[in-house]
Amino acid sequence: MLVLFLLLTIPTRAQRTTTETPKTEFIFRGFSGNQSNIVTTGAATIKLDGLLRLTDRNSNVTGTSFYHKPVRLLETNTSSTNSTIRSFSTSFVFVIIPTSSSNGGFGFTFTLSPTPDRTGAESAQYLGLLNKANDGNSTNHVFAVEFDTVQGFKDGADRTGNHIGLNFNSLTSDVQEPVVYYDNEDPNRKEDFPLQSGDPIRAILDYDGPTQTLNLTVYPANLKSRPVRPLISRPVPKLSQIVQEEMYVGFTAATGRDQSSAHYVMGWSFSSGGDLLTEDTLDLLELPRPPPNTAKKRGYNSQVLALIVALSGVTVILLALLFFFVMYKKRLQQGEVLEDWEINHPHRLRYKDLYAATDGFKENRIVGTGGFGTVFRGNLSSPSSDQIAVKKITPNSMQGVREFIAEIESLGRLRHKNLVNLQGWCKQKNDLLLIYDYIPNGSLDSLLYSRPRQSGVVLSWNARFKIAKGIASGLLYLHEEWEKVVIHRDIKPSNVLIEDDMNPRLGDFGLARLYERGSQSNTTVVVGTIGYMAPELARNGKSSSASDVFAFGVLLLEIVSGRRPTDSGTFFLADWVMELHARGEILHAVDPRLGFGYDGVEARLALVVGLLCCHQRPTSRPSMRTVLRYLNGDDDVPEIDNDWGYSDSSRSDLGSNFEGYVSSDRASSSVPSFSVTRVSSSSVISGR
């Protein structure tokens, strides 16, 4: 009987168990070296000092940062189809620095999202998470804790501009509380504090799965101990209607038109499927230093100025002499002064740090030479981490100085997975330096030509097609998706760097130009590289997005064929491919080194799209958005019209009518350049 009882009860007990799912735990005490673990989009970026910046203080920008892998948040009960949310905890330290003490915005969120891609999310009150069309949709499956700093938006739902809310599929908060913490000595006493203080603030969120209770505590990070009483503590059964089996965890942020702040995360920990946090693991001493609070500094300077005015003349003179002496001494020690405009641009780095990182700019550190300078590989800390590329502009070159300023202005604000990130800059006497992400795989030029000659390894078709679509995506961002129109003007293989996963990054923006949307180029100086310049440049010298499309078309043909665009002025790649197309033999243009190792449909598609981009009339060329739709197979590719070609006289004009910078594609570079906000050239040349 005992045996029979056991046999009957064992299956019943088994049915009551839940499926064990692995725990997820991570902790980032700063984000240096963790670029592969954090997915950033928009204005978000990981800075050299280890800070995760969600937005800078530009107007109407968004930024998102998510952990790179989804987190399992549901426990499945094997006895039924019901699932319960796993307990989880997260802690993070953040800093918000407003444009001024009274004009910051809009805030940020900690988010559970079914995808890290928040494409279409709007700025301002939508916090980079949702938009006007989908705000409130039950299909969003989004939970967010909002840290809002602006009052009166979202149909007046925000009672105060300094508040925290719990949001379910909407940015209208179900639960909203002013920002306070409770004193441990008197748990009923509230201490309020501003989110936009510019000082580190700590947030700890605990969700208990069995009771469906959420506890949220927010307090200044310099407090000695965590407040015992949380700011928000309540059941949130609504969360079970939102959470899917796997969710992405991360942050979104946004600024507004007239109200903007820089949002930073100094450290972040997360745990699911285990015990809730009993103590915080983010020690301030182990985190990166908080960013400088220029809004606070401006208030301090006004007080100092009032004090100086009240002092006697002798005291004023002594203070002035002391000030200039200290500044002069700092200059001698290569100290760096952070100026207001640098808050929204890449930061200035110390020359001595770059000198040490490149072993004194030794020849064995050179990874490329081209344009106006030489590129060196460097290490800012240990030999295996924080690798950078340092472009040293050729001395005594005014063209080089102009390029230097252009790159600081533009690429410092552009952020896209197919563009090279500019990290910082430096000027020491006659040395001008730009610092980029280091991309060890080299340029597309070397992968197409140099490496096959040296090792016999030929770039595969899948890699070529992926590279082509990546470059197209980067150009689409420059032409249509950024706040202004950026014309690159020098698209070629040596200006495309390739990551280990064959993701391309377009660089070398020293010749780029920036325009307001709807305006046209006033520049009539012809610049670029022979073989990639559109025929209309010989007639009017005016670059446009259509001339960039032409250069991309030539590059696309080059990627497929493995042949350079010109050869001693007698061979023109586009004409040759067009002749093969006219004879119905266009696949004969495919790189013979590939053998039969390519997709014929994709190769034909790429070649025809390349020819469409090389049309003699700019108005007949497709936009980069259309090009990308062709390459992705979203739209049918039209026939090439009979007016495609252009005359030999146009070609000869391209070789003789130049008044600006024109190069042949013989220089190789491992790192590109950049250009965008107005920065005074005198301030850069003088070292400020």
Curated annotation (Swiss-Prot):
It is found in: Cell membrane. One of its GO terms (cellular component) is plasma membrane. Its EC number is 2.7.11.1. ATP binds at V367, G368, T369, G370, G371, F372, G373, T374, V375, K391. Its main location: membrane. InterPro entries: ConA-like_dom_sf, Kinase-like_dom_sf, L-type_Lectin-RKs, Legume_lectin_dom, Prot_kinase_dom, Protein_kinase_ATP_BS, Ser/Thr_kinase_AS. Residues 662-688 are annotated as: Disordered. The chain crosses the membrane at residues 307-327. It catalyses: L-seryl-[protein] + ATP = O-phospho-L-seryl-[protein] + ADP + H(+); L-threonyl-[protein] + ATP = O-phospho-L-threonyl-[protein] + ADP + H(+). Residues 22-271 are annotated as: Legume-lectin like. Keywords: ATP-binding, Cell membrane, Kinase, Lectin, Membrane, Nucleotide-binding, Receptor, Serine/threonine-protein kinase, Signal, Transferase, Transmembrane, Transmembrane helix. GO terms for molecular function: ATP binding; carbohydrate binding; protein serine kinase activity; transmembrane receptor protein serine/threonine kinase activity. Coiled coil: none annotated. It is an enzyme of class 2 (transferase). Residues 15-306 are extracellular. It is a single-pass type I membrane protein. In the C-terminal section; belongs to the protein kinase superfamily. Ser/Thr protein kinase family. This is Lectin-domain containing receptor kinase VI.3. It comes from Arabidopsis thaliana.
